[in-house]
């Protein structure tokens, strides 16, 4: 009797197992059957990239065109072959926390179509990297001033931005670049194309039927814009003034189809990693505050919201100041259902979606602050606004070093940092490497001015590219806590400049230029931000605060000059001999 019960129990367990397997198989086949049924021709489906006919079918999510955009333009990307929606790549990474320097956040294996790009950068392809070959040269160099072309920015030749970028202060060339001065040395004969990748479904963002470049044309033109951005990075700048890939990349960030979404690990607030159809990736910060809302006066700087529009505005401000140290950022309206929930494989993220009493789609994810039902992010009804910041090259390809900001705040409710109580703190900093022998202290002054103009108190660390050593620029990452208060100027942000009394001549002259009525900073920012998809990006009082804070910065420099003399305060980086010595 007992043996019969045991046998029946085993049979029951086996049946349950078989039923579970059958259900899993059915659930896996269901999306394919739906897509097959959605085709007019009813031809059999496959697990490869979707053909144009399938992309156009109602069962396959379509790329949204901008309002007023012709249907043909909005569907151009939809007519091209799409990669599998869960495909990820490891050529990039974006970092805002110190621990990000230790490991990559890649989620899946590199897809076959992206392997040639990685081989070209890693040097695993025998023909990709030739350090001693004449063809071994940087792909993207600054073409230099060209009056026949419109400068970067949404304005035309008659725009205020165009006039600014034609000014001599914005036409100073960087020193000649050597192999040691570029982040990636890629063989310019290596092209990314369907033939090179041996994959006919390599996504192309152009119109249907568009052909790839002939072998005689520049190979770099066949690369996706995110890769053009990466290979344009050098010792002196993240991107050159006249790099056309930057405007194209901004457009990609706001229009490329999102194929995969995952939560970014680390950090205090929710951020999403979004992957696009061309294997590019970006960091998505959702909207948490309206434009006119200010940071509550009782909030500490370390518990303030991270604002998506601050990330967008920071990129444009950095470019107007001619620092070019912020990765490209663009605003975008995202469909929370089709572009986040339906494409994510992150179960922790997926489980936090719900429908609010007002019938809006909401989610909250997982993070240290503001990730709960009470602080959920809700769409209208499923559209949410956010910023998308382009990833920097993956840490496995281009290591970055994280530095503690000497003027880091205490991040404590009661304690003060040393620099807040010691007026001679800068003298101690200037005796500490790398601030004792390099131009790093001048980079910190640039960063101080940048943060003061935005009102950003949250600059605890910064990063540099390891390849370039100490003689390189600071990357201005993670600017979401800027533009929080337009009615208050946080003078403590300016303490490094007041203590050290050092500034680059180029920075000082540009600040003076932007204080003039004909090149007013607020007007330049308004024009630059006007081209973003979520414009207006900044509330008008924030733009007016920029002009007010600029006057405060210039007064601080004048006070330093009166105390210490012009030559002790202003470092003449525009002098030819000085710049040649700096390059060495």
Swiss-Prot record:
Residues modified by glycosylation: 101, 335, 470
Effect listed in the UniProt record for changing residue 335 to A: Impaired secretion
Binding residues annotated for Mn(2+), in chain numbering: 306, 478
Function: Golgi serine/threonine protein kinase that phosphorylates secretory pathway proteins within Ser-x-Glu/pSer motifs and plays a key role in biomineralization of bones and teeth. Constitutes the main protein kinase for extracellular proteins, generating the majority of the extracellular phosphoproteome. Mainly phosphorylates proteins within the Ser-x-Glu/pSer motif, but also displays a broader substrate specificity. Phosphorylates ERO1A, enhancing its activity which is required to maintain endoplasmic reticulum redox homeostasis and for oxidative protein folding.
Recorded consequence of changing residue 328 to S: In RNS; mild non-lethal form; decreased protein kinase activity; FAM20A is still able to increase remaining protein kinase activity
Pathological association: Raine syndrome: An autosomal recessive osteosclerotic bone dysplasia with neonatal lethal outcome, although some patients survive into childhood. Clinical features include generalized increase in the density of all bones and a marked increase in the ossification of the skull, craniofacial dysplasia and microcephaly.
One annotated Gene Ontology cellular component of this protein: endoplasmic reticulum lumen
Positions of the record's site feature: Cleavage: 92-93
Family listed: Belongs to the FAM20 family.
Identification of the protein by name: Extracellular serine/threonine protein kinase FAM20C
Transmembrane segments: 11-31
Effect of residue 311 to A: Reduced kinase activity
Low complexity: compositionally biased ranges: 71-81, 95-112
Ranges facing Lumenal side: 32-584
Disulfide-bond pairs as recorded: 362-378, 367-371, 426-500, 501-560
